[in-house]
Amino acid sequence: MKADIRVNGSTKLIGVIGNPIKHTVSPQLHNTLSSNLNHNFIYIPMLVNEGDVGAAVKGLRALNFTGFNITVPYKNEVIKHIDEISEEARLIGAVNTVKNDGGVLKGYNTDAAGFAASFKEQLGMGFEGKRVAILGAGGTARAIAVKIAMEKAAKITIINRTAARAAEIAELLLKELGIRAEYIDSASKGVAAVIQDVDIIVNTTSAGMHPDVDNCPLSQENCCFSPGQAVYDVIYKPEETKLLKAAREKGCIVSNGLGMLF
C-alpha cells in the first residue's frame, strides 16, 4: 500500500542512518504505518559516510528528530555519540534505535527483542530453562545470545568456525549474566552431540541465504535433529533453508526469520 504522507509544521521527524541505505525497506513500512494510523511523522533514509557518524548524530539532535534507527555498519560506532544506552544494548554492544527524550539521546537494541517475539509467536515456547545452541558468533549471534540469557536459559552453546569469537560471547554470558555458556568449533566432532542434546537451535549465519541456497551451517552428519526440537533460522529468503528443511523432516518445529522484521 502506498503511503499518503502529508507534511506540516507539526510533523515529527524519524529516520534511519547507514551505508549503504538504498536497500532499506524501513521507510516504506514506517510511512505506510504512519498514514494508515493517521500519525503525523515522516521516516527518512539517510546515507552517512564513514567518519561522519558523530556529525550526523549532532545534526539529528539539533534538528530535534524524535528518534532514529541505525543500520550497518554504524550500530557499534553510534554508541560513543549518544548520551545513554540500555543495559541490554550495553551487553550486546550495539544500538539500532535512538530515542530523543527531551534532548537526551537514549540508545536501545530492538533486534534481540524482535527475534524473541518472533520465536515465541512462531514456535510457541520461551527460553527459560532451555538448552540452546547458537550457530555463528557475529553481531546477530551476540544479540540473540544476550536476549536468551536474560530470559534465563539453562545453557547456551555457541558453535562457530572461529573459536575466539565464540569464546568471547560465552565469556560475556557467564561473567555478566551468570549463564552456563560454552563454545565449540563448528568443525569439531563434538558438534553432533551438542545438536542432539539441546532443546533449541538458532542459526545466525548467512549459510543458506539466497542465492547460496544449497549451503547449510551444519554438515550432513551434524544435522542429527530430534523430534520436538525447535529450530529457528534468521534467514527468510528462501522461506525454507536447507537447515530448516532437514530439521522439519526430522520432526522439529521450525521457523524462518521473517517475523523479526515486524
Residue ranges and their predicted role:
Residues 7-8, 127-128, 152, 218-228:
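Short, conserved loop/helix-junction motifs that constitute active-site signature segments
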Residues 180-255:
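Rossmann-like adenosine-cofactor binding region
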Residues 2-123, 262:
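Phosphate/diphosphate ligand-binding glycine-rich loop within oxidoreductases
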Residues 13, 131, 154-156, 180:
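Residues at the starts of beta-strands that form the adenosine-phosphate
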Residues 117, 121, 236-237, 252-262:
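Active-site capping/gating segments
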Residues 22, 164, 237:
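Conserved Rossmann-like nucleotide-cofactor binding loop
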Residues 151-177:
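NAD(P)-binding Rossmann-fold cofactor-contacting core
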Residues 18, 107-112, 119, 123-150, ...:
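Glycine-rich adenosine-cofactor-binding loop
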